[in-house]
């Protein structure tokens, strides 16, 4: 005999996990769709809380050549379901761009064709944040930085002709 009751109990969990798998698949498809000379799709994901609300940050990017400091021939799209204003999103990007996307180079060639955008769907009804210094943004900003750094590193690891990844840390300069 089959354990029908046990199976019935697990169906809601299965449906939820399928939604998660389907969601990840959609992001992989999106990252694959924007590839040009890239050999792999580039995507990153983080979760955290703003107040008591769970929020997600997804990012996809393309680029593998003409990547020099201050971005070049690359596209990056970051999305969050957090409800944050355009001013907050802009400030968060400004605070994190120099140590991520603006710090990478592949071949030293630059281009005018680069872009990073940050979208908020506002789907999550998190607490209203009006100031970039609001302590409820601390963990969110860390997670955003992780997504941006992850995507930046994926771009240079997939650089045209890249065989090595070199990180230079300068202290007491």
Model-derived features: positions:
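Proteins with a high burden of low-complexity, intrinsically disordered sequence enriched in S/T/G/P/A and R
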Residues: 1-16, 20, 111-114, 151, ...
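Glycine-rich, mobile lid/loop segments that gate access to catalytic sites or pores
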Residues: 1-101
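Glycine-rich, flexible beta-strand/loop modules in the N-terminal catalytic cores of phosphate-handling
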Residues: 1-8, 75-76, 113-133
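Flexible, glycine/charged-enriched surface loops at secondary-structure junctions
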Residues: 22-31, 45, 101-113, 150-167
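Glycine-rich beta-alpha junction loops
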Residues: 38, 61-65, 82, 107-117, ...
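Structured core elements
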Residues: 56-59, 77, 117-118, 167-170
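Short, contiguous, pocket-lining structural segments
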Residues: 65-70, 88, 107-111, 115, ...
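A glycine- and small/hydrophobic-rich beta-loop-beta segment
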Residues: 118-173
